[in-house]
Design a protein with these regions (language model features):
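N-terminal ordered "arm"
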Residues: 1-36
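Extended, charged helical/alpha-beta scaffold domains that provide interaction surfaces
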Residues: 15-18, 31-183
């Protein structure tokens, strides 16, 4: 977002490095993750657009929607230009798309908050596996930290092969491919 907004260029496609297949016809630009720039973007969105835009962007990013990064990028860059009214500009396709991606992610997360069941796999240690359409493991995990603050637990997203692990003090989201998890 930072580089795109500063350089006034919007890419046609955004790839995660591990998913990119080199194509000689494309003009590519590799952008390394820069936590200082991302911090500035987060603060800038909240200050210059509104908290709702940050919330919408985060929850839309959890979506499994194809090309979500481009929609979110356009939404944020335009938001920096027009401010909080970006959220009411639903006739613009990428704004509409971001709002709908957010709604789908939040809806699925809400549904799983009620449906998820843990099983005790060791004393004071619970496990649950999920197969969500969207990457909602972090907000779902935070919900259960608030509900079960004294319980150690793992929520295993079997689709993405990641786990939300909470030990009553802190949480981590880790790759589940290399750890022994019950079937």
């Amino acid at each position: 977002v930072f580089d795109s907004y500063v350089n006034k260029t919007l890419p046609q496609k955004v790839y995660v490095e591990s998913e990119y297949i080199n194509n000689f016809l494309d003009s590519t630009l590799y952008i390394k993750t820069d936590y200082e720039k991302s911090k500035r973007v987060f603060q800038g969105i909240e200050k210059n657009i509104c908290y709702e835009a940050l919330y919408n962007s985060y929850n839309a990013f959890l979506s499994n929607e194809k090309d979500k990064e481009v929609y979110i990028l356009k939404y944020i860059c335009n938001g920096f230009d027009v401010g909080p009214k970006i959220n009411n500009m639903l006739t613009i396709s990428y704004v509409f798309k971001v709002i709908n991606m957010k709604k789908r992610s939040l809806s699925e997360c809400h549904k799983l908050k009620g449906l998820l069941r843990f099983q005790e796999i060791a004393p004071n240690f619970c496990y649950s596996s999920i197969h969500p359409d969207n990457n909602i493991i972090e907000p779902l995990g935070h919900h259960f930290i608030n509900r079960l603050p004294t319980m150690n637990f793992i929520i295993h997203d079997k689709i993405r092969e990641i786990c939300f692990i909470y030990n009553t003090k802190e949480y981590k989201i880790i790759d589940s491919k290399n750890i022994n998890i019950p079937s």
